[in-house]
Swiss-Prot record:
Entry protein name: Calcium homeostasis modulator protein 4
UniProt key word Transcription regulation: no
Species this protein is from: Homo sapiens (Human)
Lineage, top ranks: Eukaryota, Metazoa, Chordata, Craniata, Vertebrata
Membrane-crossing residue ranges in chain numbering: 15-37, 49-71, 104-129, 184-207
InterPro entries, A to Z: CALHM (IPR029569)
Pfam families to which the protein is assigned, alphabetical: Ca_hom_mod (PF14798)
Length: 314
């Protein structure tokens, strides 16, 4: 990928409006595809409500959970600030708590975009609501239902979403009820959009007012977090690879990929036993804890390597 394209992709990734719009567009497309391919109202008493409500609410809940779960910052906050198993020596300053709350509100704002978009689109479409509310429609003012029992009335109403061929008077009632439900559903959709917009505006204002950072400081802090994550991942990958090459060479006597292997080491039975049980990463009071399966065995002959580092020879 050329540097110019890399810069464009990087700038788009940091543009919150673009990311939010992309999430909303993908949610709308997914909802339309999902609705056209999977939704089919059962048109039975007692099932319409649960079926329509499930298609309306459950995907929104799944999108909400996924919105939190797919954000790496969410797991960072959970592990560093919320986990009760965190090391006792880790002290958190008030400023750090405020910044963590600010990050959490930012994550929440991004996570609720997809479920709110799903709810708004489904309500504006009205298909799920029409199925769920069909058997609860009020038809007392229609003469054709005067001599119909309550159970029969519910059965007729439940079949309206699937009714294709029927007497003209029934079709007239069905169309009027469908328009009423469509009206109610779309009104709820617009109310949801209005409330979500107001809530987003108020939340942004409150976050800016309560933030310990100025506008420029927040911009710098956001860039700092992104660069910190990118550079750490790059350095960690290179560091772990070099460290593992060093330990593999100690265990087997050569490095994978070497063209002129003149000497190999045969691991003993004790070597295999020692590297079969993994150790945890720097847990407890031992800040110089081992990092991998190979850490127990191959470094025990030189404990000073951890403090002074490892010399990498060509």
């Amino acid at each position: 990928m050329c540097p110019t394209l890399n810069n464009i992709v990087s700038s788009l990734q940091r543009n919150g409006i673009f990311i939010n719009s992309l999430i909303a567009a993908l949610t709308i497309g997914g909802q339309q595809l999902f609705s056209s391919s999977t939704f089919s109202c059962p048109c039975q008493v007692g099932k319409n409500f649960y079926y329509g409500s499930a298609f309306l609410v459950i995907p929104a809940l799944i999108l909400l959970v996924a919105g939190f779960a797919l954000r790496s910052q969410m797991w960072t906050i959970t592990g560093e600030y919320c986990c009760s198993c965190a090391p006792p020596y880790r002290r958190i300053s008030p400023l750090e708590c405020k910044l963590a709350c600010l990050r959490f509100f930012s994550i929440t704002g991004r996570a609720v975009i997809a479920p709110l978009t799903w709810l708004a689109v489904t309500l504006l479409t009205g298909t799920y609501y029409e199925c769920a509310a069909s058997e609860f429609a009020s038809v007392d003012h229609y003469p054709m239902f005067d001599n119909v029992s309550a159970s029969k009335r519910e059965e007729i109403l439940a079949g309206f979403p699937c009714c294709r061929s029927a007497p003209s008077d029934v079709i007239l009632v069905r169309d009027e009820i469908a328009l009423l439900h469509r009206y109610q559903s779309q009104m709820l959709g617009w109310i949801l959009i209005t409330l979500a917009t107001i809530a987003a505006l108020v939340s942004c204002c409150v976050a800016k007012c309560c933030s310990p950072l100025t506008s420029l400081q927040h911009c710098y802090w956001t860039s700092h977090l992104q660069n910190e994550r990118e550079l750490f991942e790059q350095a960690a990958e290179q560091h772990s690879r070099l460290l593992m090459m060093h330990r593999i060479k100690k265990l087997f006597g050569f490095i994978p990929g070497s063209e002129d292997v003149k000497h190999i080491r045969i691991p003993s039975c004790q070597d295999w036993k020692d590297i079969s049980v993994p150790t945890l990463l720097c847990m407890g009071d031992d800040l110089q804890g081992h990092y991998s399966f190979l850490g127990n065995r191959v470094d025990e002959d030189n404990e000073e390597d951890r403090s002074r580092g490892i010399e990498l020879k060509p």
